[in-house]
Design a protein with these regions (language model features):
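Soluble or luminal CAZymes and related metallo-dependent hydrolases
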Residues: 24, 64-68, 101-108
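Active-site neighborhood of HAD-like aspartate-dependent phosphohydrolases
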Residues: 1-49
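Glycine-centered loop/turn motif at secondary-structure junctions
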Residues: 36-40, 80-81, 120
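Substrate-recognition element of Asp-dependent hydrolases with the DxDx(T/V) motif
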Residues: 88-104, 109-126
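Alpha-helical elements of Rossmann-like donor-binding domains used by nucleotide-donor carbohydrate transfer enzymes
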Residues: 27-31, 71-75, 111
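A metal-dependent, Asp-based hydrolase signature
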Residues: 50-93
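Short, solvent-exposed loop/turn segments at secondary-structure boundaries
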Residues: 19-22, 59-61, 100-101
Length: 126
């Protein structure tokens, strides 16, 4: 049998977990609404969430995810306009992830990664 040369990790729930922190999540919602020029934060977030479901189905069916601009331009906020979206799409994606909660490396995760790396394994993230 061939020797194992590499190890791939899945970030979500394997190396990284999401902690629900309501204050953090609310700040992210407010920031998203600000970036989009919307005053009704909850209505805006609800709209984005509703639009995210068809995108997620598409992404799973295509086995790929859209880049930040494509995500917001084609799926989540096409009415914002190309120029504005190009200026804010990366932060919008970041804030949308923060709406779900704070992400942390799992306990012992860093030590596992360092140990595998020091033993010569190639490491990857899926």
């Amino acid at each position: 049998m061939d020797k194992i040369k590499g190890v791939f990790f899945d970030l979500g729930g394997t190396l990284r977990i999401v902690e629900k922190v309501p204050e953090h999540q609310e700040r992210a919602k407010v920031r998203m609404a600000q970036l989009a020029g919307r005053e009704d934060v909850e209505a805006f977030i609800n709209m984005v969430e509703a639009r995210y479901e068809p995108y997620r189905e598409w992404a799973l069916g295509e086995n790929r995810e859209a880049g930040d601009y494509e995500l917001w331009h084609q799926w989540l906020l096409p009415e914002l306009g190309e120029e504005r979206l190009r200026a804010v799409c990366h932060e919008m994606t970041y804030q949308y992830r923060q709406v779900k909660g704070l992400r942390h490396v799992v306990e012992g995760g860093l030590q596992v990664i360092r140990g595998l790396y020091e033993r010569g394994y190639r490491l990857g993230i899926i």
